[in-house]
Amino acid sequence: MKKICLLALSALCLTASAQDPYLNNTIINTSDVFGTSRFVGMGGAMGALGADLSVISSNPAGLGMISKNEMSLTAGASWLGNNSAKGMAAGTFGQFNQIGAVASFKGSGKLRNINLSFNYQKKADYNNSFFGETYTAASWADQLYGLAGEAYDNRGLLYGRPETYYNTLYNLAETSGLFDDVIVKDPSDPNSTLSVSRGSLNAYEFNLSMNLENRYFIGMTVGVDNVDIRRGTDYWEQRTDEFGQIQDFGYVNEQIITGNGFNLKFGAIVRPFESSPFRLGFTVETPTWYNLKYIDDQSLTTKYYWDDKAGKAFYDPAPGQYYTHYVYDLSDSYINYLEYRITTPWKVRAQMGSTVSTNFAWGLEYEYANYPGASTRYPSSYGGTTVDQDFKEITNMMFKPQHTLRAGMEFKPVSALAVRAGYNYITSTTTPDSYWDPYFSDNALAYPTGLDYMNLSDTHIATFGLGYRYKWFYADLAYKYRYQKGEYYAFDSFYSNVEKSPIPVDLSRHSITATLGVRF
């Protein structure tokens, strides 16, 4: 088996991140609570209660309940739990989480006030890392060879271009028979993965809201998202050959995704009973339309040894010698650079909340997001964009609708002091038996990236907060614990016919935030 086969597959991997469900799910799935410390302390369940800058995202109508000018600033820190079977604790301190302002203008007649607002806040934190080992007979290199054979069977020659057969980088073997599974690996030899990701998803939001008769509130928010994800994966496996020599195979993948998105949110809140503070809220959030840019750099390092059917060695390194090949460096704008677009699903939220006297408030919220409705598009050479139907099929197969339940409360033992608590339950967007097969259809053959994927559990978020008010000034603190598990697969073992062996990953995260604000 030629070593070049691995290089050709690695070259293919560079051509599109848009086919990578691991990163795409990271972008479109923002199942967390960020914002002011009051909002976080109540678990984000303030869509019907309103009167906080962070409801600009959950229910735009809630800002209509603010009758004075307001400004707030939030900063914080977060740290990871025991982040895998072997654990890699890490923290991010000095985070800037939120800043916003409301300008309130008095109305006349039934229009009590009209407000213009701006708010910046974090939507997702991508700072994460984990390391793990599995002991299995499955081989990443073996899987890659199986994919190479699949590519040849379906494509004939790479991209259907005969000249690629003579290109050193794309030198696929002449017949698919040369891609038979050949890697025999002892389960006692480890497979190791180190994954490190950095970055965040941030939102800049502009809001118009109105208060009608102190019973009806309406609002609209225009949101602009900024995406910055940097992820590095280092995979290493080894086997002991029949002569007792250790043969290594290493794969390093560096990925960068940047870009912007746009969305709209429409909200309404009503007090159905004039004499009661009880409120009902409803929000519709359009998809976020992302324009993204992707850069990928991959390398393969191996001492594996293969023969062809005739027994002739295609590649035979000297003892102790490694062969490393970087497919293309980052300066190449054709192979390692891609522009694409993602459309996230529609979201709807139903909310309720109320106050009891002047010292207690509660809120409940339900959100539905149809993640199978997400889609990917590419710029077309004829102008406009083209929907990737193959990836849409993958999305329908892998993802399922997400349901989110939020609950929160605030208690004031005295008028100046508040104690808050909240809870979120968020269902997973993937099924436990989901897997990633980058060669499931002809179109997708030209767009694989890495072979790794992660199946996620449901998410639980518990929050606690404290607040202090004095005249025009307020200060709030919040603590958040986000609990989620994952099963990470460096590859699917379909072509190896070996039982899967995932790395258990603990995605738990702790965070604290502090907010300072003024109303005048």
Where are these regions (language model features)?
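Positively charged n-region of N-terminal signal peptides that target proteins for export
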Residues: 1-4
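Outer-membrane beta-barrel translocator/receptor signature
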Residues: 37, 49-58, 63-137, 199-202
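Glycine/Thr-rich phosphate-binding loops that ligate phosphate moieties of nucleotide
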Residues: 7
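Hydrophobic h-region of N-terminal signal peptides that target proteins for export
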Residues: 10-17
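Outer-membrane beta-barrel porins/channels
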Residues: 19-34, 40, 102-520
